[in-house]
């Protein structure tokens, strides 16, 4: 269960950071 959440966060957080800061 936890690895799935961690995997999703690993993909989600960078994309959110990219959208917010406009740095990809």
Swiss-Prot record:
One of its GO terms (cellular component) is extracellular region. InterPro entries: Antimicrobial_frog_1 (IPR012520). Disulfide bonds join 18-24. It is found in: Secreted. Keywords: Amphibian defense peptide, Antibiotic, Antimicrobial, Cytolysis, Disulfide bond, Fungicide, Hemolysis, Secreted. The keyword Disulfide bond applies. GO terms for biological process: defense response to bacterium; defense response to fungus; killing of cells of another organism. The keyword Lipoprotein does not apply. Expressed by the skin glands. Pfam families: Antimicrobial_1. It comes from the Eukaryota. Belongs to the frog skin active peptide (FSAP) family. Brevinin subfamily. Antimicrobial peptide with activity against Gram-negative and Gram-positive bacteria (MIC=13 uM against E.coli, MIC=3 uM against S.aureus) and fungi (MIC=6 uM against C.albicans). Shows hemolytic activity on human erythrocytes (HC(50)=7 uM). This is Brevinin-1SPa. The lineage of its organism: Eukaryota, Metazoa, Chordata, Craniata, Vertebrata.
